[in-house]
């Protein structure tokens, strides 16, 4: 029996479609574990075993990811050539949403990151938030650094590194901010008018903090403290 060319074409299309990875929402991607959600952010802790890959998943919102530990990752964005990323511990990047991809861990150790979606990204594009007093710059501290990395969608990202005993000088948070622990942290926050409060965090821990206060932050641990802050208006 001879098969018609049209029938063979249909069969080929069915096989091709079945071979393509189905697209899932980020909330259904099993390597993305929801850690925190509020009107400002949706935060996922991501862990990918050596040589493993995520499902094809969609990023609908602009987001920042914070790398935990060195890694090498292949980024396969749908409709674009593959790209290889060599990442260092604490590397923090912003990516605009609206794409679908697969991430593959090319290294021999787990790929870990914290992914923070900006839930008000569309609002920020339509009505840009106020400018920050400073949007880029490195501050050298006594025993540490404060590096303002970038401002995206009105959110200011900074990396803080404090050696044991070092203090981040007094500063004011008018709005809320998110803390992402890159290293384990043993810190003390001294809020003006309230006194000192201890903070104990493991690497990858996140904490949402309200605004409306001034404080200093001291590393009271025995090792370097590294963390990322995302500040909101």
Which residue stretches match the model-derived regions?
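Positively charged n-region of N-terminal signal peptides that target proteins for export
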Residues: 1-5
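Bacterial N-terminal signal peptides
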Residues: 6-18
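Histidine-centered divalent metal-coordination motifs
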Residues: 57-59, 101, 171-173, 215
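Short, well-ordered beta-strand segments in beta-rich or mixed alpha/beta enzyme
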Residues: 67-68, 103, 115, 162, ...
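Active-site scaffold segments
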Residues: 64-67, 92, 178-181, 206-209, ...
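Glycine- and acidic-residue-biased ligand/ion/polar-headgroup-sensing regions
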Residues: 60-78, 173-193
């Amino acid at each position: 029996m001879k098969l018609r060319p049209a029938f063979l074409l249909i069969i080929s299309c069915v096989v091709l479609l079945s071979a393509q990875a189905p697209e899932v929402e980020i909330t259904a991607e099993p390597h993305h574990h929801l850690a925190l959600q509020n009107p400002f952010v949706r935060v996922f802790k991501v862990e990918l075993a050596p040589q493993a890959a995520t499902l094809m998943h969609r990023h609908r919102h602009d987001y920042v990811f914070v790398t935990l530990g060195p890694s090498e990752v292949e980024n396969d964005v749908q409709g674009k050539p593959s790209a290889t990323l060599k990442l260092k511990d604490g590397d923090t990047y912003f990516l605009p949403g609206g794409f679908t991809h697969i991430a593959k861990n090319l290294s021999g150790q787990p790929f870990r990151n914290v992914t923070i979606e900006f839930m008000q990204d569309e609002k920020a594009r339509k009505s840009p938030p106020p400018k920050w007093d400073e949007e880029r710059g490195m501050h050298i501290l006594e025993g540490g650094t404060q590096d303002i990395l970038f401002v995206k969608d009105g959110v200011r990202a900074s990396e803080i590194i404090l050696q044991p005993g070092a203090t981040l000088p007094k500063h004011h948070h008018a709005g809320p901010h998110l803390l992402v622990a890159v290293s384990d942290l043993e810190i003390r926050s001294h809020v003006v008018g309230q006194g000192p409060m201890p903070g104990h965090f493991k690497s990858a821990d996140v904490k949402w903090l309200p605004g409306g206060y001034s404080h200093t932050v001291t590393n009271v641990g025995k090792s370097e403290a590294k963390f990322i802050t995302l500040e909101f208006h």
